[in-house]
Amino acid sequence: MNSKIYFDNNATTQCDEHVIDSMLPYFRNNYGNPSSIYSFGKEIKEEISKSREKIAKLLNADKEEIIFTSCASESNVSAIMNAINNNPSKKHIITTKVEHASIIETMKNLETKGFNITYLSVDNKGRLNLDELKESISDDTLLISIMMANNEIGNIYPIQEIGQIAKEHNILFHCDAVQAVGKVKIDVKEMNIDTLSLSGHKIHAPKGIGVLYVKKDLHYTPLIFGHQEKNKRGGTENVPYIIGLGKAAELLLEEETEINTRLEFLRNKLEKEIKENITDVHIYGDLENRLPNTSSIAFKGIKGEEILLVLESYNIYVGTGSACNSELAEPSHVLVACNANLEDYSPIRISLGKYNTEKDIETFIKILTNVVNMLRSLKDNKNGK
C-alpha cells in the first residue's frame, strides 16, 4: 500500500492548502514587525486584526477578547494562573479526571503549592455528573475548568449548563475547547464562558499557534509579560501562523456543517462495518453525545498498541489515546477514569478529518479485519488453543 490513510486527526491535522497559501507572503515579503510605527509594520498589524476578527466570529466573541498564544497548553495554563491571580485569597479549583495533560499536570503542581483540587469523576461512558459539580463548590472555589469535548473518547460535555452553574456561584469558568472547535457550535456568551483555549493544529492550521479567549470585563494578568497583544501576551507576534489560523477559522465558518455531516456518516459507517466483520468489539464513550469524527474502539484480547503497529506497516495511522501521552508507558488516564477493562479491551482511537474518504473507510475495514484476525490467531497459537 503506497497511499497513506491518516485516521489520527485528534492528534493533529494536515495543514490546509489555502491556509499555507495565506501564510507564504508573510514569510517571503510581508515580514515587517507589527509593532513598528512605519507603514510596513502597520500593514501587518492590520492583517493580524483581520485574523482576530475571524477567530472571534467563530466563537461569537469580540475581537478584543482574543489573545494569540504559542499553543493551547499555554492558553490553558494562562487561564488557570489568571484565575488564581484574580482570587488570591481562595485555594480551591474544580476540574475533571479526563482533562488534557496540560490541565492535569498544572493542577498537580498547584497541589504542591497548597491548592485544593477537586477532580470530578466520570461514569463508565465518560459522562460527568453535574450534581457532583454542584456539591463540590465551596466559598473557597476560585475556578471551574472543564473541557468541551474529550480528545480520546470524543464525549461532548454540557458546557452551557456548567457555565450557568459557575455564573450562579460567581465562579470563573475556563473551557478547553481544543477538540470541539470546528466540530461543536461554540457561543462563549451563551455558554457563560470566561476563558477558553483553542489550538491551530487541530483545525488544519499550523502547529505553534493557539488562542486564549478572555471575557472583556475580566481582569487579565499575563503569563508572559510584554507590550504585544495590548500588554496581555509578550513576544513578537508569530505573524504567518496568526494569518494561517485566521484563514482556518474562515474556512470553518464556510465548511463546518457540511464537513461534520460527512464525518459523522463516515464514522458511523466505519463502526457499523467493523461490528459486522469483527467479533467482540467495544466502543468507549457516550455514543449519544460525542464528536462526529471520533471512535475509541477495542477488540477483545488485542492491545491497541499491537493493532497500531501492524496498521502502520500498511501506511495506516490511528491513535491509542492522547498523542501528548503516547511516549509514556502508562494506561490512558481517561479510560482509567471510565473504569475500563483495559486488560481485555485496549482501544485504538480513530479520529477522522476532512480529507478522509469513503474509500479510505472501505480499505481500512478490510485491512483491520485481517489484522485483528491475525493477531487473535497468533495469540491463540501462543496459548495452545
Stretches found by the model and what they are:
Residues 1-385:
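Pyridoxal 5′-phosphate
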